[in-house]
Design a protein with these regions (language model features):
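Short, Lys/Arg- and Gly-enriched loop/turn segments at beta-strand edges
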Residues: 1-4, 24-26, 164-167, 225-229
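PDZ-domain C-terminal substructure recognizer with occasional recognition of PDZ-binding tails
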Residues: 2-40
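Terminal peptide-recognition signature
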Residues: 15, 54, 209, 213
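Charged, low-complexity helical/coil segments in non-catalytic cytosolic or luminal regions
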Residues: 19, 47, 55-183, 192, ...
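Generic structural signal for well-ordered beta-strand positions
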Residues: 24, 65, 216-217
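Short, solvent-exposed secondary-structure boundary/capping segments
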Residues: 37-42, 179-185
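Catalytic nucleophile loop of clan PA
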Residues: 197-218
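C-terminal subregion of chymotrypsin/trypsin-like serine protease catalytic domains
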Residues: 214-245
Length: 245
């Protein structure tokens, strides 16, 4: 966009935009700043990237779902409009531990040469795309989908390198009528995970929740007041969202 703007100079320019989903054409006249660069007074975000967790993969269709919540603009908190995207392998290099009032995060590197497959949608219930049948990251046995109940459960998460481990959690409460993906309250009880991360941190979104040998949901949010507690989305809600993209 910048290169086109500089080529056009200060001549009036027609921009085709979308405002709340509706197309709109605007005419703008660029101005030169103190450095002589043509500007239109708009902050344009053309891409973003982050670490998250793949929740499920269907070998029959190649479809996958991740995060359990949408990717939002960090300033407006609005769901980011989706153009195109890819899923890349990442390696966790460090952890900023979560604490009361401060969300932690996983920090790592992306393998930019390892494009695993395209994303096709960014929704309130997760991001969705496809992986090839020979994807080497897919391993293990398939699990049936089930409904969460209050009680002990586990999550699978990668908080160091590329190793996925299973950690103990407790499903404290089900919130089946929640409309924002916060359909259950969970508490991390595994001492190893608490020691490593302080509880739930950014980057663990999408970590699958397993209970009684079934896939019942995914981790979505952390409680800022207590990093050992957070929310999860039910697997049924996430799968329904994936089928409708």
């Amino acid at each position: 966009f910048q290169s086109l703007l500089q080529k056009n100079g200060t001549d009036a320019t027609a921009l085709e935009i979308k405002r709340q989903g509706s197309p709109l054409t605007l005419s703008v006249e660029p101005e030169r700043n103190e450095q002589g660069i043509c500007c239109i007074g708009a902050w344009i975000r053309d891409s973003m990237a982050g670490i998250g967790t793949v929740t499920y993969y269907d070998p029959a269709t190649g479809d996958f779902g991740a995060l359990g919540h949408g990717i939002t603009d960090g300033d407006t908190m609005a769901l980011m409009p989706f153009g195109s995207g890819s899923i890349l392998p990442s390696t966790v290099k460090a952890v900023k531990k979560g604490s009361s009032g401060s969300a932690g995060e996983l920090r790592g590197n992306f393998d930019l040469s390892g494009d695993l497959g395209p994303l096709c949608a960014n929704t309130d219930c997760g991001i969705f795309g496809t992986l090839p049948a020979d994807c080497t990251l897919v391993a293990g046995e398939a699990l049936p989908v089930g409904d969460a109940v209050e009680g002990p459960a586990t999550i699978r998460a990668n908080v160091s390198g590329d190793e996925v481990r299973e950690y103990a959690v407790e499903i404290l409460k089900r919130l089946p009528n929640a409309s924002d993906g916060r359909e259950m309250v969970i508490s991390v009880t595994d001492p190893d995970l608490i020691a490593a991360t302080g509880g739930i941190v950014q980057g663990m979104s999408g970590s699958p929740i397993l209970q009684n040998g079934k896939l019942v949901g995914a981790v979505t949010h952390v409680l800022l007041s207590d990093a050992t507690k957070g929310y999860g989305i039910s697997m049924e809600t996430m799968l329904n969202a994936g089928e409708n993209v």
